[in-house]
């Protein structure tokens, strides 16, 4: 018996519709057992129905990262949720045949004081108040000073997060199977401060410095922590990875062109 659990966006009609259809389909298959939220830790697969935000929220619930994620897109963009709503049955048929296409996504472990978080996309520091002019921060790489950043903030992203906030701030696109740090300044005051890519084997420490007094640290767009001057945000790669089930014919570069219109003439 293959045990799985389902997380879906309860605020979206399309996601609710797919959830009901999927539940009916799975119950018709004797090989699958659908678990409730209380028993999610026993699941071999977790099905996420919604958009990228639903997957990121679901990621926080997943304690055992050995579980495999089946991400079904119920919306429009769905860069992380690559399985189309009309193609999910083939995924489950392939599971029964033992044919699974899995891609590992590496994520951060983030330590802020005594609190610990996981970040699949990014960690970023911004102003705590829109009225404040700038936020000043320093970054250290394995205890070596990298530089001081002045502006609206700074983003530290994974390759998975390279197509999210970091991209909007002018960062590069990086293929998601890599283990790297992308550091992207947000509206820097110094024109020489540009995005930089670092090895994933290092530890990054981000600190707030004067004249800033307070800042906000955001983890995957959902967790907000107010930090004071000289507080440390420690970021390193987890030894675990997230396993995402992909369609057989999935081609990353096709996804890049289809979802982000990369390289296309938009005029």
Curated annotation (Swiss-Prot):
Q: Where is the active site?
A: 52 (proton acceptor)
Q: Which domain of life is it from?
A: Bacteria
The enzyme class is transferase
**Keyword check for Kinase:** yes
Compartments where found: Cytoplasm
- Per the record, GO CC terms? cytoplasm
**Could you provide one GO biological process annotation from this protein's UniProt record?**
NADP biosynthetic process
Spell out the molecular function terms from Gene Ontology.
Answer: ATP binding; metal ion binding; NAD binding; NAD+ kinase activity
**Which reactions is this enzyme annotated as catalysing?**
NAD(+) + ATP = ADP + NADP(+) + H(+)
What are the names of the required cofactors? Answer: a divalent metal cation
What InterPro entries does this protein's entry cite? ATP-NAD_kinase_N, ATP-NAD_kinase_PpnK-typ_C, NAD/diacylglycerol_kinase_sf, NADK
Keywords assigned:
ATP-binding, Cytoplasm, Kinase, NAD, NADP, Nucleotide-binding, Transferase
Q: Which family does this protein fall into?
A: Belongs to the NAD kinase family.
What name does the UniProt record give this protein?
NAD kinase
UniProt organism field: Fusobacterium nucleatum subsp. nucleatum (strain ATCC 25586 / DSM 15643 / BCRC 10681 / CIP 101130 / JCM 8532 / KCTC 2640 / LMG 13131 / VPI 4355)
- UniProt lists the gene as nadK
């Amino acid at each position: 018996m293959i045990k799985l659990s389902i997380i879906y966006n309860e605020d979206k009609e399309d996601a609710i519709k797919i959830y009901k259809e999927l539940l009916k389909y799975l119950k018709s298959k004797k090989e699958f057992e659908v678990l409730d939220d209380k028993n999610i830790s026993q699941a071999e697969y977790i099905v996420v129905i919604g958009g990228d935000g639903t997957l990121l929220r679901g990621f926080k619930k997943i304690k055992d990262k050995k579980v495999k994620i089946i991400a079904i897109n119920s919306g429009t963009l769905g860069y992380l949720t690559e399985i189309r709503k009309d193609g999910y049955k083939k995924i489950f048929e392939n599971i029964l045949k033992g044919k699974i296409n899995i891609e590992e996504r590496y994520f951060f472990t983030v330590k802020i004081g005594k609190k610990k978080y996981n970040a699949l996309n990014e960690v970023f520091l911004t102003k705590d108040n829109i009225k404040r002019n700038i936020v000043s921060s320093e970054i250290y790489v394995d205890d070596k000073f990298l530089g001081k950043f002045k502006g609206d903030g700074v983003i530290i992203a994974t390759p998975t997060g390279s197509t999210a906030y970091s991209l909007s701030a002018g960062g590069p696109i990086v293929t998601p199977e890599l283990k790297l740090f992308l550091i992207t300044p947000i509206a820097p005051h110094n024109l020489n401060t540009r995005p930089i890519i670092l090895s994933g084997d290092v530890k990054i420490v981000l600190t707030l410095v004067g004249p800033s007094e307070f800042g906000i640290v955001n983890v995957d767009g959902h967790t907000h922590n107010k930090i004071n001057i000289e507080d440390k945000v420690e970021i390193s790669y987890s030894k675990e990875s997230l396993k995402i089930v992909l369609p057989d014919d999935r081609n990353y570069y096709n996804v890049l062109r289809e979802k982000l219109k990369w390289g296309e003439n938009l005029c």
